Amino acid sequence: MNVSVNIKNVTKEYRIYRTNKERMKDALIPKHKNKTFFALDDISLKAYEGDVIGLVGINGSGKSTLSNIIGGSLSPTVGKVDRNGEVSVIAISAGLSGQLTGIENIEFKMLCMGFKRKEIKAMTPKIIEFSELGEFIYQPVKKYSSGMRAKLGFSINITVNPDILVIDEALSVGDQTFAQKCLDKIYEFKEQNKTIFFVSHNLGQVRQFCTKIAWIEGGKLKDYGELDDVLPKYEAFLNDFKKKSKAEQKEFRNKLDEARFVIK
C-alpha cells in the first residue's frame, strides 16, 4: 500500500497575549519570551491508501486542529504534512459563506477547488440531489440550520471525488437517515481505496467503519494503531472519565491544559 498522508513531527503553537503591549513586545523584541499554548505537540503518523482513521479524544484534545492541518486550512508551526492526492474537508459550515445562497456556495466553493464553470454546471444537480435541500438551495446559508449546512458541505465534498477525505463532526448534526446515507457513501470511498480521517465522538460510527484509531490527548498522540487494538483502550479511559464527578473531570482537563502552556 502507498502512503497517502505522512504527518511528520507536527506541532501547532499559539502565542497567548493578555494585552496589546505584550503583543507589541513579541513583534518588536527578538527572542521575546511569552506564554505559548501547544495545541499539538510533535505528532507523527502515516496513513495508507484504504485507511479509515478515527481521530478520537475528549473535547479540546486537538482533534480538529489536526484535521485542519491535514486538510491544509491550517499550517503547522513545526513539522510538515505530505499528501499524495486531492484533499476535501467536511466540517459544519467549512468553506461556506452565510451571505451566499446554497447554490451560489456550490459554485464558489468548487471554483476555489479549481473546477471550471462547465464542470461545476454538470456536477451541481448531483450535489443538490444528494443534499436533499430542495428549494432551500436557493436561500442564503445564514438561514440554514447546522444540519442543513452539514448536508450542503458534505454533498459538495463527496461529489468532487477527493483522494483524501477529512470529516470533522459533520455527521453529528442533522437526521439519522441522511447520516446513514453519508456513511454508505464513505463505504464506497473506502472500497475505492481512498484515505479517510474521521473526527467523531460517536464511537458507534467509529467502530462501524474505521480501520485504525489515532487517540489524541492533551495535544499529543497517545496511541495509534488498528481499531481492535486502540479503541478498547480509549473506551476504557472514557468510561473511567465519565464516572468522575464534574469537579474531577475539570481537574483532569486542567492538568492536561497546564502541561500545554510554556513560556518561550
Curated annotation (Swiss-Prot):
Q: Which SUPFAM superfamilies does UniProt cross-reference here? A: P-loop containing nucleoside triphosphate hydrolases
Q: What class of enzyme is it?
A: translocase
Q: Which reaction does it catalyse?
A: ATP + H2O + teichoic acidSide 1 = ADP + phosphate + teichoic acidSide 2
Do you know which Pfam families this protein is assigned to? ABC_tran
Molecular function (GO) terms for this protein are:
ABC-type teichoic acid transporter activity; ATP binding; ATP hydrolysis activity
Location in the cell reads: Cell membrane
Q: Does the keyword Metal-binding apply?
A: no
Q: What is its main location?
A: membrane
Give the keywords, sorted. Answer: ATP-binding, Cell membrane, Membrane, Nucleotide-binding, Translocase, Transport
> What does the record give as the function of this protein?
Part of the ABC transporter complex TagGH involved in teichoic acids export. Responsible for energy coupling to the transport system.
Query: What family, per the record?
Result: Belongs to the ABC transporter superfamily. Teichoic acids exporter (TC 3.A.1.104.1) family.
What is its quaternary makeup? The complex is composed of two ATP-binding proteins (TagH) and two transmembrane proteins (TagG).
| Protein name stated in the entry | Teichoic acids export ATP-binding protein TagH
Organism of this sequence: Staphylococcus aureus (strain Mu50 / ATCC 700699)
Q: What is the lineage of its organism?
A: Bacteria, Bacillati, Bacillota, Bacilli, Bacillales
